[in-house]
């Protein structure tokens, strides 16, 4: 399991690095916004899956099969500090995955820049410890 967890961590770290690169671009271009949204979705997917695998590796998790239950369990066991922000991230990921509205996309990109990227890095810091 440790090897699988290490691989999942690396996938998350790579996704996070690519998201950070995209966030340095000018968001006045809708193609850039689309790219950031896609990278946010992918980074979020990698994040909740690495949390799930970490919890399983620790013998903590049996019931979490989906992002919401994994986030709740990760918050309960202090992998993440702010479960509400992670739930908000999940809901925003769902919004961007199931429909497209330019104004919503730009607002989510702003949240990624202002809040979500910080939470991803806090998770990375926890996993690196």
What residue ranges belong to the model's regions?
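Solvent-exposed interaction patches of small proteins and small membrane subunits
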Residues: 1-129
